[in-house]
Amino acid sequence: MIDLPRHPPSMLPVIRTVPEHAATGELKRRYDAVKSAFDVPWMGVVAMAHTQYPRFFDALWEGFEPIAGTRAFQDACRAMRAATEAGVERSLGISPLAHRLQDLGYDPREIGEIRTIIEVFSHGNYPYILLATVSRYLLSGGDLSGEPQVFETSPRSPHIFHQPILMEPHHADEHTRGIFADIQATLALPILNTDYRALARWPSYFHLAWAELRPLIRTPSHAALSQQLHEQAIAVLRTLPNPARLKGDMVTRGCGR
């Protein structure tokens, strides 16, 4: 059985990607295919990085896209989300911010918009986690064990999500750029994830939320939750159906550009 230890993000190489607005032709087709399969309005950086190696990505996606359409995959994403959110509520003790935002002058519509953006990423991050986990597992010599014949596709009602408006570093004031830098340093991230750029659209909320979260990073409870999610993703990939018979040698043959 292949061992996949959890590595901190700082061990990642430099990630080079093409932003969605600049993607054209075959690259845009790949981006659109991922967003459609995952029912999300944004292309995650982890998937963008995969598409920088087109032959590899196409081989992986040919087998992974049918998996993403199964009920088992979608149920697994929901279960991972539920376990993570329950763990956060149980062990991190994060304080609600709604009343503090109201004191700053936020009305219910504005708070609702923030909650919608949070829902976009809370819904959409888990398919990307599973894509990254399956990709790493296959490249490490593993093979998916799920049966190709036994699976149930899941017709779903697409979420009506609009593409998030992002606060890029060159849009932000000095204070927000400082928070961006602090997030990357504190979380040891080689890139600034889309989630943070989307939530920074409301700077006063963003400052409050990061001030609340930052002291919890790297605490034993935070580390345990991170490890729990990592282990849950590995457990899921070993039970997923495999309708297109995705195998490790299929993706390793595509590792050249």
Curated annotation (Swiss-Prot):
Its EC number is 3.8.1.9. Keywords: Hydrolase. The keyword DNA-binding does not apply. InterPro entries: AhpD-like. GO terms for molecular function: (R)-2-haloacid dehalogenase activity. It comes from the Bacteria. It catalyses: an (R)-2-haloacid + H2O = a (2S)-2-hydroxycarboxylate + a halide anion + H(+). Catalyzes the hydrolytic dehalogenation of small (R)-2-haloalkanoic acids to yield the corresponding (S)-2-hydroxyalkanoic acids. Belongs to the HAD-like hydrolase superfamily. S-2-haloalkanoic acid dehalogenase family. This is (R)-2-haloacid dehalogenase. The lineage of its organism: Bacteria, Pseudomonadati, Pseudomonadota, Alphaproteobacteria, Hyphomicrobiales. The gene is dehI.
